[in-house]
From Swiss-Prot:
Similarity comment: Belongs to the NfuA family.
Alphabetically ordered keywords of this record: 4Fe-4S, Iron, Iron-sulfur, Metal-binding
Organism: Acinetobacter baumannii (strain ATCC 17978 / DSM 105126 / CIP 53.77 / LMG 1025 / NCDC KC755 / 5377)
Gene encoding the protein: nfuA
SUPFAM superfamilies: Fe-S cluster assembly (FSCA) domain-like, HesB-like domain
Protein name: Fe/S biogenesis protein NfuA
A molecular function GO annotation: 4 iron, 4 sulfur cluster binding
Cofactor (UniProt): [4Fe-4S] cluster
Keyword Iron (UniProt): yes
Length: 212
């Protein structure tokens, strides 16, 4: 497989995306049925960097190729990767799993929902990034999640992040331990100017929570 860009106006990161041999075989069969010389697939992410992120694939005839796409040449077809989607497709794997009903194409993209932040990002953007990239993956194991409500400049306590816990974290009796030892520590490590982290969620209301 070779990787190239079709134009110099492309993203700086080279896509680290894998299409497994079984997926290549399956896609080759689909593309062959299109009867279009040079047809390939285009890979992109809708709503990248958000909880609603969705990885997508579409047919791409030669005349439909976007000039800024990255091109990955596989033995039987080309794959074109949407340049703005590249950071969200790092370490992505497209696979095909056969079963008695035929099979299923799967798309695993661990970075598709992780927000990207630059050097000029606001503190809200930086906090959201840490929550999505570092904290929520751990909370997900307990069926929980955490989101930023707001950042307050408290006269008494300084810069304060107000968080909302949901899912399995809502109603959890160990929330104080979780918040103080885990979430707050991690946020302060990444954002030194943050002085305090507080929980907006009322953990006395266990209805709708996984842990009661």
């Amino acid at each position: 497989m070779s990787t190239e860009n079709t134009n110099t106006a492309v993203a700086e990161e080279i896509p680290n995306l894998l299409i497994t041999p079984s997926a290549q075989e399956y896609l080759h069969e689909l593309l062959a049925k299109q009867n279009t010389p040079g047809i390939g697939v285009r890979i992109f992410v809708e709503h990248p960097g958000t909880p609603r992120a969705e990885c997508c694939m579409a047919y791409s005839a030669p005349e439909e190729v976007v000039p800024t796409d990255y091109k990955q040449d596989y033995p039987d077809f080309p794959a074109y990767i949407d340049a703005p989607s590249i950071p969200y497709l790092l370490d992505a794997v497209i696979d095909y799993n056969k079963d008695r009903f035929g099979g299923q194409l799967t798309f695993r993209a661990p970075n598709s929902k992780v927000p990207r932040v630059g050097p000029d990002a606001s503190i809200e953007e930086r906090i959201t990034y840490v929550l999505q990239a570092e904290i929520n993956p751990g909370l997900a194991g307990h069926g929980g999640n955490c989101s930023l409500v707001e950042v307050q400049d408290d006269p008494e306590h300084g810069l304060t992040a107000v968080l909302k816990f949901g899912g399995g974290c809502q109603g959890c009796s160990a929330i104080d331990v979780t918040l103080k030892q885990g979430v707050e520590t991690t946020l302060k490590e990444h954002i030194p100017e943050l002085q305090r982290v507080v929980d907006q969620t009322d953990h006395t209301q266990a209805e709708g929570a996984y842990f009661k």
